[in-house]
UniProtKB/Swiss-Prot annotation:
The lineage of its organism: Eukaryota, Metazoa, Ecdysozoa, Arthropoda, Hexapoda. Residues 1-23 form a transit peptide. This is Succinate dehydrogenase assembly factor 2, mitochondrial. Its main location: mitochondrion. Plays an essential role in the assembly of succinate dehydrogenase (SDH), an enzyme complex (also referred to as respiratory complex II) that is a component of both the tricarboxylic acid (TCA) cycle and the mitochondrial electron transport chain, and which couples the oxidation of succinate to fumarate with the reduction of ubiquinone (coenzyme Q) to ubiquinol. Required for flavinylation (covalent attachment of FAD) of the flavoprotein subunit of the SDH catalytic dimer. Belongs to the SDHAF2 family. InterPro entries: SDH (IPR005631), SDH_sf (IPR036714), SDHAF2 (IPR028882). Interacts with the flavoprotein subunit within the SDH catalytic dimer. GO terms for biological process: mitochondrial electron transport, succinate to ubiquinone; mitochondrial respiratory chain complex II assembly; protein-FAD linkage; tricarboxylic acid cycle. Keywords: Chaperone, Mitochondrion, Transit peptide.
Length: 158
C-alpha cells in the first residue's frame, strides 16, 4: 500500500520538479540592448529636518595616527563599492600624502554624510561640488578609471 502511494506521488510530482527550458525567439534568450545604456540614477535629497552629526575635528592628531585612522575608515565604509575603491586608493597613495593632502582626504571621506555621494562623484555619475573637487578627488577619479586594468575584487592586505 505504501509502495503504491509513493509510486503515485512520484509519478505526479516528478514532472513538477524537473526544470523546463524556455523557448525564446532571441539567440541565447537574451536581449542585450536593454543593458547597453546605464539606467538613470534615482537619488533623493535628504529631508530638511534630518539631523546629521558633525564629524569631530581632531586638530592635534599626529599624522601617523591620522593615516592609520583613515586607512581603517576607508576599509570600513558600510558599502562594498566604496570599501573596494577607497581601500585600494589608500593602499596606493596614502603613504605618500603630506599633512595637507591627508587633511583633504579626511575631509572628503568624513565630511560627506552620504557614502553614495562619494561613489557617484568618484565614478563621475554626478558632478562633484566645488568644496570637494580637490586634487585628492581628481586623483581618486583617476584611480577609479583603472587605466592599468588592475583587478579590484577584494581589499588589499594590511
Amino acid at each position: 500500500m505504501l509502495r503504491q502511494l509513493l509510486a503515485t506521488a512520484r509519478r505526479l510530482l516528478l514532472p513538477l520538479a524537473t526544470p523546463k527550458r524556455c523557448l525564446s525567439s532571441k539567440p541565447n534568450g537574451l536581449d542585450k540592448s536593454e543593458y547597453s545604456t546605464p539606467p538613470e540614477v534615482i537619488d533623493y535629497e535628504d529631508p530638511e529636518g534630518l539631523p546629521v552629526p558633525e564629524y569631530p575635528v581632531r586638530p592635534d592628531e599626529p599624522l601617523a595616527t591620522r593615516k592609520q585612522r583613515l586607512l581603517y575608515q576607508s576599509r570600513k565604509r558600510g558599502m562594498l563599492e566604496n570599501d573596494l575603491l577607497l581601500s585600494t586608493f589608500v593602499a596606493k597613495y596614502l603613504k605618500d600624502f603630506d599633512e595637507d593632502e591627508t587633511a583633504l582626504y579626511d575631509k572628503l571621506i568624513n565630511g560627506v554624510s552620504n557614502d553614495w555621494d562619494i561613489y557617484y562623484w568618484a565614478t563621475e555619475t554626478k558632478p562633484t561640488p566645488p568644496e570637494y573637487d580637490t586634487d585628492i578627488m581628481k586623483l581618486l577619479k583617476q584611480h577609479v578609471k583603472n587605466t592599468e586594468r588592475v583587478q579590484r575584487i577584494r581589499q588589499p592586505d594590511l
